[in-house]
Amino acid sequence: MNGGYEICAGEQMDDPVVADHFGKMWRHSPVPESALVDDWFDRTMAFIADARAAGTFLTYLARSHDEIIGSLAAQQFAGLYPDVIRHEYRRYAYVWGVFVCPAHRRQGIASALMRRSLDDMRPLGCSRVLLHASVMGSPVYEGLGFNATNELKLDLVA
């Protein structure tokens, strides 16, 4: 146990907590709650089930005593376009859900979750890890060696 918490791999029985944390992550973001679809939990659980069935899903939990105080979800990234590059050159992982309960933030928990996931991604042959960070989360990831890329965006909806 590190600083009153421990990091462990999540199991299928933990998926509802990971899905709940994913919803909380969005509710703690600048996205208005009204933007979330009503069935966000069911959609997240279905997404997780598909990723688990494909064998590409990793989850990690931060536990303090018997309470889950944080989680991370990641998976092999299939990409946004046809995969024509050999896997040894381009086998990406995508971290899509890092959440730490507000009362436990600023204690290194998100960094510990990330370090554990990175340790497990390397032996899987991942060549790069991608994520999208909130303003609050960016310093955490930059401290782990992540850097800004050439991704550009254009908001078409005001």
Feature roles, as predicted:
Residues 6-20:
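A short beta-loop-alpha structural element at the N-terminal edge
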Residues 26-47:
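Conserved GNAT-fold acetyl-CoA-binding loop/helix
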Residues 46-61, 94:
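A short helix-loop-beta-strand connector motif used in the catalytic cores of GNAT acetyltransferases and
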Residues 61, 67-76, 94, 99:
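Conserved beta-strand in the GNAT
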Residues 79-82, 130-136, 142, 147-158:
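Conserved catalytic-core motifs of GNAT/GCN5-like acyltransferases
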Residues 86-102, 154:
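Conserved acetyl-CoA binding element of GNAT-fold acetyltransferases
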Residues 104-116:
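Conserved acetyl-CoA pyrophosphate-binding loop and the N-cap/start of the following alpha-helix
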Residues 121-133:
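Conserved GNAT acetyl-CoA-binding A-motif
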